[in-house]
């Protein structure tokens, strides 16, 4: 039986920290679905289609990653995709409390859905898409934190 995992997030935009998590997940699971949430309440900078396209290009070198957009409840999406593992990145202790709430709710909605928490490599443990966008808005150099295609797209958006 194939081990299918979902790595959900807004990915607005996908960062090297996200890539670190998804790359390591590909070594643990047979198939990893990078599930990009529509998240209209977060007012993303990039459209869902743009975020999917950016993530597809950034993960093209990973053979067992599928990138899809979604707007459904995570438990329903996981059930539809026949995945019973959720991958979540934990950067700091502050992330854990929120992630624990999500994990418990997801398990309530789909009892066989397990949450697996991965800590990013030290190099990426302090970055977030929001922080990268904020630094870029103020002309800070964020090249190191983004895949090349994503960096170019961010610079184009900020023009």
UniProtKB/Swiss-Prot annotation:
Annotated positions binding substrate: 10, 42, 74, 88
Family: Belongs to the bacterial CoaD family.
Subunit structure as annotated in this protein's UniProt entry: Homohexamer.
Key words of the record: ATP-binding, Coenzyme A biosynthesis, Cytoplasm, Magnesium, Nucleotide-binding, Nucleotidyltransferase, Transferase
Protein name, per record: Phosphopantetheine adenylyltransferase
SUPFAM superfamilies the UniProt entry points to: Nucleotidylyl transferase (SSF52374)
Entry's Gene Ontology molecular function annotations: ATP binding; pantetheine-phosphate adenylyltransferase activity
Gene: coaD
Enzyme class: transferase
Names of required cofactors: Mg(2+)
Cellular component GO terms, alphabetical: cytoplasm
